[in-house]
């Protein structure tokens, strides 16, 4: 009995010490970055803003998101974080990155709250939600976005990422570009969001160091796992952007590339063969201009997902290709799957718990029709 009491006391002590340490780390960070633009709110103010947390927008492993309203009348989204070491680091990453920047294609961080175990981040509210619900519709009667709007979204996302890479005093690498992290305002203008995995580097640093691979399965650049491909750099975001474009065009979620299904194949290879033969995708009653825009999206995506980082364009070059003349675009080499026999670099523990050998989840297309 005494042993159980001692063990319980030790667990409580460790729990309290860990959370005190987290609080201290966050407070130290905030004290050292007083010049950041976001406003610090008290927890009582957060409760008023959300009207007692009545309108819940969503929930995830990080915590919950609520709709709120500032005294100015501005509608906001309030992300309440569950206290943990991971979420504490995510909180610091968010405030450190988007707390210092402003761009039309990057979500704006309005404020935050740190009050004991109560952590919150306050953003501009995006009424049209995230991009994934438009390219992976779950409702049968869902009206898809036009190809023209999808093309404009692709351009906006590219501009947002380009700004992160080149438009700030520091180089910001996002490391988690995917449809779920692209929010859409009332005019469907895209905003890059969720900077929990982002890292800040010197603007002139071409290769960066990481202690662990980071990102979401299917969008992670191969160099984060395989050492003989090349160093980790802003080209990792370029790769993720390419996979995002592929999903926007293919309108298919990621599945296991090793699934034994003869009706499915690796989508980039399939679409590469079509484009290389001069064939268009089946796009219904799309106009010729829309077909050209989608063709550009595909070719740019194929360049962005090249295996070696050195073969991928910068975001500036990718945007130049997206905005340029389709006739001037050259086809890149055919994309390949990650090779299973490449040596794996030890980047530490994978935060997603995904072994490197399983990072071959690829987008597929059904040959029986969508």
Question: What residue ranges belong to the model's regions?
Answer:
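Intrinsically disordered, low-complexity cytosolic regulatory tails
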Residues: 1, 21-23, 76, 261-262, ...
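Regulatory alphaC helix of protein kinase catalytic domains
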Residues: 91-96
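A conserved loop-to-beta-strand element in the N-lobe of protein kinase catalytic cores
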Residues: 116-124, 132-133
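Terminal membrane/secretory targeting segments in land-plant proteins
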Residues: 1-34, 132-140, 200-202, 217, ...
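Short beta-strand micro-motifs within the conserved protein kinase catalytic domain, predominantly
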Residues: 110-117, 127
């Amino acid at each position: 009995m005494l042993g159980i009491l001692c063990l319980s006391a030790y667990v409580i002590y460790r729990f309290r010490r860990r959370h005190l340490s987290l609080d201290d780390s966050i407070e130290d960070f905030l004290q050292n970055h007083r010049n950041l633009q976001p406003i610090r709110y008290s927890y009582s103010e957060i409760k008023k803003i959300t009207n007692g947390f009545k309108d819940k927008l969503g929930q995830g492993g990080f915590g919950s998101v609520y709709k709120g309203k500032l005294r100015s009348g501005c509608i906001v989204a309030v992300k309440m974080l569950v206290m943990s070491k991971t979420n504490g680091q995510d909180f610091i990453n968010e405030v450190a990155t988007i707390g210092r920047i402003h761009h039309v294609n990057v979500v704006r961080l309005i404020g935050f709250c740190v009050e004991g175990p109560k952590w919150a981040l306050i953003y501009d509210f995006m009424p049209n939600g995230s991009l994934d619900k438009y390219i992976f519709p779950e409702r049968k009667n869902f009206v898809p976005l036009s190809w023209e709007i999808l093309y404009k979204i692709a351009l906006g996302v590219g501009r947002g990422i380009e700004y992160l890479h080149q438009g700030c005093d520091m180089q910001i690498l996002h490391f988690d570009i995917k449809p779920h992290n692209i929010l859409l305002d009332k005019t469907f203008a895209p905003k890059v969001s969720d900077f929990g995995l982002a890292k800040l580097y010197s603007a002139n640093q071409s290769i960066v160091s990481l202690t662990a691979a980071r990102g979401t399965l299917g969008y992670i650049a191969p160099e984060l796992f395989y050492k003989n491909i090349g160093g980790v750099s802003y080209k990792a975001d370029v790769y993720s952007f390419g996979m995002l474009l592929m999903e926007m065009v293919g309108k298919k979620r990621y599945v296991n590339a090793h699934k034994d299904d003869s009706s499915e194949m690796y989508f980039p290879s399939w679409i590469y063969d079509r484009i290389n033969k001069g064939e268009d995708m089946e796009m219904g009653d799309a106009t010729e201009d829309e077909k050209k825009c989608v063709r550009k999206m595909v070719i740019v995506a194929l360049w962005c997902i090249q295996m070696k980082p050195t073969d991928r364009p910068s975001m500036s070059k990718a945007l130049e290709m997206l905005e340029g003349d389709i006739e001037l675009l050259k086809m890149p080499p055919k994309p390949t799957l990650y090779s299973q026999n490449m040596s794996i670099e030890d980047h530490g523990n994978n935060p997603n718990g995904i072994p490197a050998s399983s990072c071959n989840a690829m987008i597929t297309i059904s040959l029986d029709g969508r």
